[in-house]
Amino acid sequence: MIDPDVVKRSSLIERWMTENIRKFNMIYPGIDEKELGSILLDIIQQKGTNSKTLLHNNYQRQEVSSTVLDMYDWVQNRKPIIAGGGTYFMNQRKAHSPIYTVIKRRKKDRKFYQHRRDTHPLGSYEWFHDEMMQGESKVKINAIYGSFGTPSFQFYNLYTAAATTLTSQMMIAATGIAIEAFMSDSPVYESIDDVLYFFDCVFSREEYKYNYSVLPVISDWRIVAERYISKMKVPSELKLIDIAIIERALKNCTEEQLTRLYYKNNLYAFLDTPLIHGILIDIFNTNTNFLNPNDIPPELQTYMDVLWNYAEEFVVWNHNWTERIRRLATQERRAVIGVDTDSNMVHLQPFVDYLETSIWYCAEYNTQTRQEKEFMSANIATALLTKMIRKLLDRHTEQCNVLPEEAADINMKNEFLWSRCLWTPVKKRYVTKVLIKEGKIIPEGSKIELDIKGFDFKKAAVNKSIADKLANIILIHIMRPEKINISNILRELDALEKEIIQSVTSGERDYCLRMSCKEPRAYARPESQGAVISVQLWNLIYPENPIQIPTKCDVVLLKGVKMDRLEPLRKDYPEQIQKIEKYIFDGPNKAYYAKHGLKYLALPNDGSRVPKMFLPLIDVNWTLTRNLGTFDSIMASLGVPMNELKRKNKCYKYYGNTLDV
């Protein structure tokens, strides 16, 4: 129960009652609102709970006990910035943040390098220099965000880093579910309350620019009812009362309300109307190349503005979906096919296909190539999405009390148009073939044609030789061909396997691991770190050419060699074997070597080959696994998992002809 005095003064309960009275009016027009309000008040008093809350200021080490209803009123009155995880910040007018000034300066630096980069020829030295510098600025900004979660940081706060992460997740989910709704109308309604809330948002809009009759009018409530009932979570298990409520609400709608409900999130029905069909034909008849949705050509600006104005009024539902983070993660998606930390990857092919079949051949004055029309189609969709997301973020930041002058910095930009994307089951691990980057066509053979994210073969521990060869297989045999031929990929991997074996057994270092070795004191257990013991082994045997640490070096994988395996080599290498026996197997770390043997040998960064003494001790199979095994997730995505062979404490992997069907 909630105290009646608390109920009367709570702005949250007042808002709840107002919204519910509007919903009941949809179903029962002319209902006695005073009597209904009395019933709602009784319900909230008898069944509501005003839970306790705690407001904690980590900087000032202050705590204030409160309740949910009082906290809501406090937020409405004080207008703090609302961040993820129930975290609140004072805005920039009330408190100065030096670290925020640093972030803004670094963002300005990044924009400077991005702008200067775009003045250089794509792929030139100057272009790559400024691309690197803008990337460095981004890393510096992200480093500040990460530092806030580190207790040793001077401005450490218990909540800031988590709040930043959750705010980002919240905004990505908000934009992702909005894109999904706009492009494919796929979000489902999980309750009758979801449906009525959607209706209420449409009916409560204060002003519309266009008369509803500019589009084909929907006067039959049954058409609209079928559309919304089919979008309930489990239509086959709908309660009869839910269907009755939807039908009754729609029976009471005016012709205008039915029409506006029908076109909301119904993009393709909207595009099929004569008015919009004609605008799209006019756009294609301009024969204008459209490569950058952030910079619409002057010849298209008026058409795109008109198209957006109609879409914004009739199609866009500019409100947040409830539980959007969970919805985006669990509900079926047809438009947003990938979500990264700060990105939504949108599937534009259905939109392009629609324009091809419905518009391209109606634009009789269009003389563009197929690729130019594809780019035009994709960027029409992306330009609409850009404006839709800007409207959504404006509303979102306003509701979160972000100052208007700061809200513009919260944005999503369109950066890439891809022709193909290969996804893997592992989060944030994918490969794309880039067609356009920030308005510039990426030619075949460009260094940035292939964009690889998160794969092991692109990480620091993998030698550049194997990384380049595996990337080339992806580009030539997966991303460029219209159809992927698995046999060709396996043939390339088989040839690469033979090349690795030949290289390793002949003492070449092309396929060694690449390890970073720090000072031993930097590790909790340096005696078990491969980078440390590999350098120690080299420096012990070859003191005349020592490896200085800290450093990055190539590391040879050995078979876990113990003294009995080294004895046959004593005749040819007596001095080296004696050192190994005395300082390693009988040294201070002898327990480790008795169990594991010699597993790693570092090589100096002078290009020298693997010493002849160690050639028979190289673990060729483990070297193959550590190199080709980094390609495992790529092949698994194509239905060709690696075979595994377990021996002792190692799991060797190799490719066969087994398909995962």
Locate the predicted segments by residue.
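Conserved acidic
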Residues: 1-661
